[in-house]
């Protein structure tokens, strides 16, 4: 099922085609996904690093309806916003998905191949005894290595997860960790894995503050990175790069910024990037900082609780 794929875009990411092709190839799918508008919000901030916003007004309850896309180039940022919209649409449970779901307890799944929720990290109050008799929704998925079909708890697939059957019980609060789209299956799988590695490395760093090394900005020779750093520097925005690669061994970099001009605590932004190519990891972290800033200024996303708290706390305290 997984194939060797030839890459054709290397400027600020590794993709199978140019961003212009991504936009052209998927334009007709925007209506299906409910994406009504993709807007350039780069100029809302003074940095000048491309950021776009995509809007899905009819996103399901519990999901955000405004998404952001980042990139070192305009078309890359536009494609990024569009593809995030597709990700979120694909994560929602559609009517066609409900037709494939089965409702059963673990005890009654003995005749099927399934992913046992006992192997997942669950809230401590959900014990094995409770799991055995809890009625869950299960969705058929394909193992990409063995190409065999397994039933997986629907709670771990869909976001937001609202059981379609009243007798089914959610096990945990859902999230979009590891959700990724791509021009081809292999590209989506790779970037989903990168996101999981990235979140894992950041969690370890937050917990123990080890495996960190500051990167000397002046030592970087990559022209794309230099251009991004120069854009921040020209606007008196200090950027610190840290290598927080975990024991997994895939390069993970954080970029944190402090705006000496505005001194707005909500613009104390952080970006994290993971990639097999360290330069791409840095580019992803830097463009995520730009995305975070523009998103806060844009003020349309529903998940800005952190920014509101930081503004309330004040710049000096943060």
Residue ranges of predicted features:
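Helix-biased "structured C-terminal domain" signature
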Residues: 1-318
């Amino acid at each position: 099922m997984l194939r060797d794929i030839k890459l054709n875009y290397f400027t600020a990411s590794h993709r199978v085609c140019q961003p212009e092709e991504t936009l052209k190839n998927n334009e007709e799918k925007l209506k299906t996904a409910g994406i009504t508008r993709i807007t350039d919000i780069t100029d809302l901030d003074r940095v000048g690093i491309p950021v776009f916003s995509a809007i899905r007004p009819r996103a399901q309850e519990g999901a955000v309806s405004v998404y952001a896309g980042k990139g070192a180039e305009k078309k890359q940022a536009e494609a990024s916003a569009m593809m995030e919209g597709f990700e979120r649409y694909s994560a929602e449970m559609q009517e066609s998905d409900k037709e494939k779901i089965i409702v059963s307890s673990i005890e009654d799944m003995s005749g099927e191949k399934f992913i046992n929720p006992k192997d997942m990290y669950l809230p401590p109050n959900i014990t094995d005894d409770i799991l055995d008799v809890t009625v869950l929704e299960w969705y058929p998925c394909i193992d990409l290595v063995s190409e065999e079909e397994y039933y997986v708890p629907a709670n771990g697939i869909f976001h937001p997860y609202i059981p379609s059957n009243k007798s089914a019980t959610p096990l945990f609060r859902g999230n979009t960790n590891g959700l990724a789209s791509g021009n081809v299956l292999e590209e989506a799988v790779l970037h989903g894995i990168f996101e999981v590695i990235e979140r894992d490395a950041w969690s370890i760093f937050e917990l123990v503050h080890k495996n960190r090394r500051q990167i000397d900005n002046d030592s970087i020779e990559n022209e794309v990175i230099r251009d991004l750093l120069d854009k921040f520097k020209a606007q008196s925005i200090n950027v610190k790069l840290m290598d927080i690669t975990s024991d997994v061994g895939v390069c993970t970099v954080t970029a944190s910024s402090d705006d000496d001009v505005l001194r707005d605590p909500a613009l104390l932004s952080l970006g994290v990037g993971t990639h097999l190519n360290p330069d791409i990891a840095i580019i992803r972290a830097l463009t995520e900082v730009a995305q975070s800033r523009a998103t806060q200024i844009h003020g349309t996303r529903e998940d800005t609780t952190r920014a509101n708290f930081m503004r309330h706390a004040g710049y000096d305290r943060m």
